[in-house]
């Protein structure tokens, strides 16, 4: 009986309130993570996009901010839609370039959001990520 209860509770451990502002506590996290460094393929592609575009130059290697803001903090309140708008259009008045012309960003922005949301939620560790075992 205990095993069934524990296994039923396990999926809940990786869930977050992605749309907490909408008051939806059952909203699933946009990522799947195991052991802090094994993630689903979409989230892994988001991490690869982060690395390829060298976002750490402004936001820090652990997303805690440098000249750009801490994304660990920002993603606690920033909606997915606002994240998309910010990444695509940039915030030139604050020094962030628009990334809308990047094919990689267009293809992987949701994975990038998932990666950063996982970092913000404290579920994804900083550093190198690996794919979940299939």
Question: Language model features by range: what are they?
Answer:
Residues 17-44, 52-53, 97-134:
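Flexible coil segments in periplasmic/lumen-exposed cytochrome c-class electron-transfer proteins
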Residues 55-58:
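Short cysteine clusters
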Residues 1-7:
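Bacterial N-terminal signal peptides
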Residues 7-19:
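Bacterial Sec-dependent signal peptides at the C-terminal "C-region" and cleavage site
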Residues 37, 43, 47-48, 60-101:
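Gly/Gly-Pro-rich "capping" loops immediately C-terminal to redox-active cysteine motifs
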